[in-house]
From Swiss-Prot:
InterPro entries referenced in this protein's UniProt entry, alphabetically: Cyanase, Cyanate_lyase_C, Cyanate_lyase_C_sf, CYNS_N, Lambda_DNA-bd_dom_sf
Keywords: Lyase
SUPFAM superfamilies, alphabetized: Cyanase C-terminal domain, lambda repressor-like DNA-binding domains
Any one Pfam family match given in the protein's UniProt record, by short name: Cyanate_lyase
Alphabetized PANTHER family for the sequence: CYANATE HYDRATASE
Similarity-based family: Belongs to the cyanase family.
Record's keyword annotation contains Lyase: yes
Protein name (record): Cyanate hydratase
Catalytic activity: cyanate + hydrogencarbonate + 3 H(+) = NH4(+) + 2 CO2
Gene symbol of the encoding locus: cynS
GO biological process: cyanate metabolic process
Species classification: Bacteria, Bacillati, Actinomycetota, Actinomycetes, Mycobacteriales
Organism: Mycolicibacterium vanbaalenii (strain DSM 7251 / JCM 13017 / BCRC 16820 / KCTC 9966 / NRRL B-24157 / PYR-1) (Mycobacterium vanbaalenii)
Superkingdom: Bacteria
Enzyme Commission code(s) on record: 4.2.1.104
Amino acid sequence: MTREDATAEILAARLARGLSWQQLAEAIDRPLVWTISALLGQHPVPVESAEILVELLGLDQSAVPVLAAVPMRGGLPTAVPTDPTIYRFYEVLQVYGGAIKELIHEEFGDGIMSAINFSVDVERKPHPDGDRVVVTFDGKFLPYAWTAADGRR
C-alpha cells in the first residue's frame, strides 16, 4: 500500500462511515488541522494513533506502518494549485507575501517563520456581509545565522 492509496482509502472510509475530521482528531487527541494534514499524507502518525484511526475507519492493518512512515511533505500535483480553495492561499501569498515578509523582518529581524515548529488554526467568524474564514499561522521565528563548519561566524 502506498501513501496515496492510504489517503484515498481514508477519504472514502471517512465519508462512508459518516465520520467528521473533528471526530477523528478527538479519537487520537490531536489538533484538528494537524490530524487532517496527517491523514492527507503530510505528517507521520504515531503508531498508537494510526491503530486507532485504522480501527475507526475500518481499514486494513497494513495501513498502520504507511501512516506512521515519515512522508514526502509539501508535494502538490502541479506547480500552481488548481483547486480553488488552495489557489486562494497561493494568491494571498502572491499579493501579500512581500508585505508579510517585510513585517516579519521589521518586527523580528532577518529570518523566517518556521513551518516545522508551527501550528495552524481555522475558525469561522460571523460578519454582517457573510461569515469570514480566519486562518492563523503560528510559527517560531528562526533568525538567519551564518555559521561555518568550524563554528566561526
